[in-house]
From Swiss-Prot:
It is an enzyme of class 6 (ligase). Keywords: Aminoacyl-tRNA synthetase, ATP-binding, Cytoplasm, Ligase, Nucleotide-binding, Protein biosynthesis. InterPro entries: Aa-tRNA-synt_II, aa-tRNA-synth_II, aa-tRNA-synth_II/BPL/LPL, Asn-tRNA-ligase, Asp/Asn-tRNA-synth_IIb, NA-bd_OB-fold, NA-bd_OB_tRNA. Belongs to the class-II aminoacyl-tRNA synthetase family. Its EC number is 6.1.1.22. The keyword ATP-binding applies. GO terms for biological process: asparaginyl-tRNA aminoacylation. The gene is asnS. GO terms for molecular function: asparagine-tRNA ligase activity; ATP binding; nucleic acid binding. This is Asparagine--tRNA ligase. GO terms for cellular component: cytoplasm.
Length: 466
């Protein structure tokens, strides 16, 4: 017996008249007056289910087939035939239907045959991948993930696994989740009455990582080209459509590289992964274009064919001032541009993806390379039409004296970062990198308006279910 994924049958990979068995779940059942049932069976391998045509002469037709409801799991054996129905070229002429698992109560099944709101689906995150929309998101997410790994592999990068538990704050924002095994009901205290983290598991205060960048720098300064791709954590009390407490980051780090080098890398990577998803997940993208965002496909096609614009932060501020727009947030040199500013630049002024470079140092992290003007750093943001910032990066400060001065200026004790300073003490090199928020990328591709709907189990303030 040959078990076949539904995608192989529908794509014509298997020959007509061959006998196969598909395994999956019932999306719908329709019965005709002629004594034939039509089962829509999906297995998640592609967007569409396959239609199984079931005759009433099967021995379990009355006792089981006619009782199948949405969500029941089945194995259907039959012959692949050309389909006269619209929408797919092939269907299955069933010779056997085996029920693997029943839905106990079809009336109360949370994923019953009806369209559910996105908000409702968040409440049943353990069942929502069974829906068209979240199933499509999952396949697109996988495609993008595989394409990212493939891109860096082809470019000669080494993937490194950055630690999730750290004693360093890469962003200097202090919005970190503490990791501790201390008994909260009986905390050890030091002589000053503060919690004594010397008694904790790691012998010091530790946190969940906000970025793998600092660790990636250590490997870039030995392997030349590396990247991390893993979960990061931010304890921001933000209830927006763009924020999660747990999310995934793609962070390449390149030795002997400048800001311009990683700006080009960012453009090449985004175009590569968008071309991949357009080629590999067209069925899912067509669904998003029909149900979620009409521009889902054309936006990616235009992105891939566009030349990225580049502009200095100072010039970008002047463009915003000269726009005549009444922005919600005032535009002045030194601000951290808001989403409305970013989207104006990408969507209305440049009408293309744009890289903004050389930001004021006072709004950027300690590790960014200071420019000769003493006011700005070699930092960049990639702004995409439709979403705004999608990538943030910089050239790293490779000069030890300037790095030390910057840390002191920002209230960071250089001694606490001795291992990071060693990279500058022993064979320092110019190096650069960036961070891509993976959920924002998936949101951009699918048109899903909230990042909570593009990660399997979203972690947000007051919510850590499942």
């Amino acid at each position: 017996m040959t078990y076949a994924p539904v995608t192989d049958v529908l794509s014509g990979k298997l020959a007509v008249d061959s006998e196969v068995t598909v395994r999956g779940w019932i999306r719908s059942r329709r019965d005709s007056k002629a004594g034939i049932s039509f089962l829509a069976v999906y297995d998640g391998s592609c967007f569409d289910p396959i239609q199984a045509v079931v005759p009433n002469d099967l021995n379990n037709y009355n006792d089981e087939v006619l009782k199948l409801t949405t969500g029941c799991s089945v194995e259907v054996t039959g012959t692949i035939v050309a389909s006269p129905a619209k929408g797919q070229d092939f269907e299955l002429a069933a010779t056997e239907v085996k029920v693997v698992g029943w839905v106990e109560d079809a009336e109360t099944y949370p994923m019953a045959k009806t369209r559910h709101s996105i908000e409702y689906l968040r409440e049943v995150a353990h069942l929502r991948p069974r829906t068209n929309v979240i199933g499509a998101v999952a396949r697109v997410r996988n495609c993008l993930s595989q394409a990212i790994h493939r891109f860096y592999h082809e470019q000669g990068y080494f993937w490194m696994s950055a630690p999730l538990i750290t004693a360093s704050d890469a962003e200097g924002a202090g919005e970190m989740f503490r990791v501790s095994t201390l008994d909260h009901a009986n905390l050890p205290l030091d002589d000053k009455g503060n919690v004594d983290y010397d008694k904790d598991f790691f012998g010091k205060e530790t946190f969940l990582t906000v970025s793998g960048q600092l660790n990636a720098e250590t490997y870039a300064c030995a392997l030349s080209k590396v990247y991390t791709f893993g979960p990061t954590f931010r304890a921001e009390n933000s209830h927006t459509s763009r924020h999660l407490a747990e999310f995934w980051m793609v962070e390449p780090e390149v030795a002997f590289a400048t800001l311009d080098d990683v700006a080009k890398l960012a453009e090449d990577m985004l175009k590569y992964v968008f071309e991949a998803v357009l080629a590999e997940r067209r069925d899912d993208l067509e669904f998003f274009a029909s149900r979620i965002d009409k521009q889902a496909i054309t936006r990616l096609e235009q992105f891939v064919s566009s030349d990225f614009a580049q502009v200095d932060y100072t010039d970008a501020i002047q463009i915003l001032k000269d726009s005549g727009r009444d922005f919600e947030f005032d535009v002045e040199w030194g601000i951290d541009m808001s989403s409305e500013h970013e989207r104006y630049l990408a969507e209305e002024h440049f009408k293309a993806p744009v890289i903004v470079k050389n930001y004021p140092k006072d709004i950027k992290a300690f590790y960014m390379r200071q420019n000769d003007d003493g006011k700005t750093v070699a930092a960049m943001d990639v702004l995409a039409p439709g979403i705004g910032e999608i990538i943030g990066g910089s050239q790293r400060e490779e000069r030890l004296d300037i790095l030390d001065a910057r840390m002191i200026e920002m209230g960071i004790d250089p001694e606490h970062m001795s291992w990071y300073r060693d990279l500058r003490r022993y064979g320092t090199v110019p190096h650069a990198g960036f961070g891509l928020g993976f959920e924002r990328l998936v949101s951009y591709v699918t048109g899903m308006g909230n990042v909570r709907d593009v990660i399997p189990f979203p972690r947000t303030p007051r919510s850590a279910n499942f």
